[in-house]
Each structure stands twice: as C-alpha cells, then as structure tokens.
C-alpha cells in the first residue's frame, strides 16, 4: 500500500501555541512523518515559522474561497452573539480574553468578514468571536477538500470537528476525530456548555473512527456521548524527549519548591494543591509553593492563600510559555497535577523528562501509562500532602523517582503513538 496522505485540521501548531493541544499536534505530525505519512495541516492563522519539514502547513487565512459567500452575512444575522466563557478558551489569559471581547463588541456586527479575493481573516486565537471563527474555518475546509489530494481526514478537538465533517461530505473520504478533551472535563456534569457538547457529539457521530488520548476519555465518549465502543480507539499521548536533567539552574534560595503548572480552573484542581500546601507547611516550613498559570479561580485562591497564612510561601507566576516553563521545571523539587478530570496530561511527562519527581491524580489519562509517579485521588488532600512531604523529606525516594521516571518517559515516543494512527488510517482507506 502506498503511503497515506492525511488532511489534518488543528487550531494551533508550534512554535506559537497556547497549551498541550498544539504540542500534541506537532508530536503527532513528527511521528507520522517518521512513519512515512504525508500530512497536510490546516490551521486558522499560520505565522510562517512552523516546521514545514514534518507537514505542509496550509494557512486558512490565505485560502481563496471557491464557494459562493453571498449568504454568509445572512447566516450571521440569525446567530446571536454568544460570549465564550473561560472554560472554552482554556489557554487564554483572562485579561487578554476580556480585552478581545471588548474589542469585538466595539467593532459591532457590521465589520467586514470577507477580505480581498474572498479570503477569510482569522485571528487563530481563543477570543470572544471563537464560534464565528469555528464556523468560517469549516467553510474554508470545504475549499481545501476540493483543492488537495488526500486519503483520510483527521480533526483535532471540537474546534475543528465541523471542518472535518464538511471535508468528509465534499470528498467522501473517511474522517477521524481526535478527542483531546471533552466538555465534561472542562465543565463537569452540571456546568457544561451545551453548544460545544452538541458540536462534539455531532463530530463523533459523523466520524468513521474516534481516537481518544486515554481510556479515561474513551469511557466518557462512550458513556456520555453514546458513541459505540467498537468505534472508539485509545492512542495515548507521548512526549518529545529531550535530556533536560543537566540543565538545572541556580535558583538563589535553599527552600524546596513544589510546583503546580496549568490552568487555574475547576478542571485542574488548584484548590486541592493550596489545601495540601497548608498541611505540608505545618510539617516542613522550609518549602515554597508555586502556582504557574492563569484562570478564573486565581483571585479566589489568592484570597484563600492569604486566609491560610501562606502569603510569604506561596507564589503566583501567571501564565508561562516556552523556556519559562522549562525553567520552572528546573527550579522544582516536586511537580503536582491534581486534576479533577484530565483527559491525558502531557505536563507530568515534561516534568519527569526534566528529572522532577511527580505526583498526579488518579483521575487522569496519563496515570494509565506511568508507573513511577505517585498517584492520589484529586480530592484526598491528606494523601497529596503526605506524598509531597515524603518526596521532600526522603532524598532516596526523590532520587529513585527522578531516575526511574526519566527512563520511563523516554519510552513514550510520538513515533509509536503515530504508528497506531497510521494503522487506523490504513484500516479505513
């Protein structure tokens, strides 16, 4: 069989990313390239510095529409503006989101949505007009599907499911939707956004195969979305392995550092990290706790830290990117991911790659592939505090976790994950 050609839809691609989704897209593309699969990667707005050696990058903002666009404005007259909540813009700084929302409302309904030569202009961000961009991106997908040759369609997360559906209808080629997270993870049972849930469900139903990043997510897809089990396949995420353990930096303090790195939202369980920190401080005062990230629970947690008397031992850094993330790992003695519902969780792999002993919640996909991280129930702050204390108090345990964890993540390669995807492609072609 000839090498497969995949038309892939994704909202972001390194080096300009906002979180784990873009990192995963790059890892998958790199792995597919090593396995002989040619990737056409369609993103809303390319910057020109993406890695073109692993995928042909198609900038949706540069695609001249083939369809008649006269009815687009009529369509939007019947769509009420919906403010996108922070749970739908998971990697956008709250201040940036507010600024974009205000700018969008200021510009009003009559701004031009089609530019010269029938090209849509995308921001490629998670801003207040996100739903509008999702719709326009799907229209562009129809043009791309007519213009390029490919064998299979692969759509990453709910933002691109509609694009995948349209590409399938136009081309007749099989569709795979890749579930990196669900609305149940973001909003829980009673706080989910019904519009996003409907988009997710429609995408899963239209797909020929549904790929999930963990068995944890697979069970949610089957039970909460009603997707037949035989249609849903788990392909665990991996990590771009880089030897980072020799890159420790002088941090200027002797205190131990325990780090939470992620969105400060309900899904990520930051309040359990704060409560566990208070318990650890009663047993070991020479510890500092760092919460690196942003989100709607940040201000309440700042107040809670003050109530607990942790103000001088607890630090909020805001959202970190790129080298700042790696520097934070280099400073850390323990990394904690206490997520309430985590589809996978790449950050623990990155921490362990950096030689940081790691604690994760049992309610996570990454718990399925790690043996050398301590696993606790997200709600059990006593167990979490004990785990943090144990790593800090017993150097032998810390060194064991560093060594074994480092070796373990070295085996979780994107090339292996992508080989599973290649096999799925070939089963559908």
Predicted regions and their residues:
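A conserved catalytic-core segment of Leloir-type glycosyltransferases
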Residues: 3-4, 40-145
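Conserved donor-binding/catalytic core segment of Leloir-type glycosyltransferases
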Residues: 211, 252-277, 402
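Carbohydrate-associated surface elements
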Residues: 216, 238
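Nucleotide-activated donor-binding/catalytic signature segment of Leloir-type glycosyltransferases, i.e.
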Residues: 300-320
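Short alpha-helical donor nucleotide-sugar binding micro-motif in glycosyltransferases
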Residues: 319-320, 327-332
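Aromatic "clamp/platform" in nucleotide-sugar-dependent glycosyltransferases that forms part
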Residues: 340
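Short hydrophobic beta-strand element within catalytic cores of glycosyltransferases
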Residues: 357-360
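Conserved acidic donor-binding segment of nucleotide-sugar-dependent glycosyltransferases
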Residues: 373-382, 390-395
């Amino acid at each position: 069989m000839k090498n497969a050609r995949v038309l892939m839809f994704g909202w972001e691609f390194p080096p300009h990313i906002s979180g784990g989704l873009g990192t995963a897209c790059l890892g998958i593309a790199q792995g597919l390239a090593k396995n002989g699969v040619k990737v056409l990667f369609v993103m809303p707005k390319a910057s020109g510095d993406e890695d073109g050696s692993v995928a042909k990058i198609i900038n949706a903002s540069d695609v001249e529409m083939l369809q008649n666009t006269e009815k687009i404005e009529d369509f939007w007259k019947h769509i009420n503006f919906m403010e996108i909540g922070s749970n739908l813009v998971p990697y956008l700084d709250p201040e940036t989101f507010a600024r974009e929302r205000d700018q969008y409302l200021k510009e009003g309904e009559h701004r031009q949505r089609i530019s010269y030569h029938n090209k849509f202009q995308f921001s490629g961000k998670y801003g207040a007009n996100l739903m509008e961009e999702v719709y326009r991106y799907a229209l562009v997908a129809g043009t791309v599907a007519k213009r390029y040759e490919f064998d299979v369609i692969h759509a990453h997360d709910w933002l691109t499911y509609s694009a995948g559906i349209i590409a399938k209808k136009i081309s007749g080629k099989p569709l795979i939707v890749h579930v990196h997270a669900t609305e149940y993870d973001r909003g829980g049972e009673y706080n989910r956004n019904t519009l996003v849930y409907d988009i997710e469900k429609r995408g899963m139903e239209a797909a020929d195969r549904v790929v999930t990043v963990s068995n944890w997510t697979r069970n949610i897809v089957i039970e909460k979305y009603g997707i037949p089990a035989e249609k849903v396949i788990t392909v665990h995420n991996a990590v771009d392995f880089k030897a980072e353990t020799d890159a420790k930096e002088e941090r200027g303090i002797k205190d131990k550092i325990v780090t939470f790195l992620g969105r400060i939202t309900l899904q990520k369980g930051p309040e359990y990290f704060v409560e566990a920190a208070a318990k650890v401080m009663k047993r070991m005062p020479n510890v500092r706790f760092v919460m690196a990230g942003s989100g709607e629970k940040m201000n309440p947690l700042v107040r809670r830290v003050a109530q607990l008397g942790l103000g001088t031992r607890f630090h909020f850094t805001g959202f970190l990117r790129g080298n700042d993330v790696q520097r934070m790992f280099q400073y850390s003695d323990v990394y904690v991911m206490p997520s309430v519902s985590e589809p996978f969780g790449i950050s623990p792999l990155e921490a362990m790659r950096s030689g940081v002993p790691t604690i994760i919640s049992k309610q996570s996909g990454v718990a399925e592939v790690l043996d050398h991280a301590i696993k606790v129930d997200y709600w059990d702050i006593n167990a979490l505090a004990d785990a943090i204390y144990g790593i800090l108090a017993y150097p032998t345990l810390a060194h064991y976790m560093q060594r074994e964890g480092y070796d373990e993540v070295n085996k979780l390669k994107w090339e292996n994950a992508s080989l599973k995807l290649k096999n799925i492609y070939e089963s559908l072609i």
